[in-house]
């Protein structure tokens, strides 16, 4: 395999660039820090996403680290987890309930790890594509606690650029306010063959 990582600061257009290369909108695009988990694209006969979650022992270790040293980079994952579980104001200034963190842990954190698959319906409709992106976004967006439990995401696609063993990796932004997500990107870059840096164009 030949690993190509797309990196850059928040809002530099990384995910949009990835989608251009794939000739499909598979990577989440938003004005918020949208890529909160490392996503690897590889060649496959159909579009399918596999989301892998931290095993229970790994999750417990991070939780313990948070109790011992909340300032530790890895502990920030748990800090964000708890923040998203609290009641807070939405973008309209209205109060909304936080997420049920215990229910999410019960569903996704298991002994030996756990994974789920999301498939793109093979009917070629815009609705099917939108539904795939919506379901995937639940685990990639930094505005929901789900991403805190994610170990990694792999998406298969028949995109020609992925043929021949190319792995295209979309990473969290280097300017992300959550330091642990920046660390994820730094670790990925240490193990790739090519690094493509996206830089936002300056406004005239």
Regions found by a protein language model. Give the residues of each.
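Globular "head" domains of long coiled-coil molecular machines
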Residues: 2-204
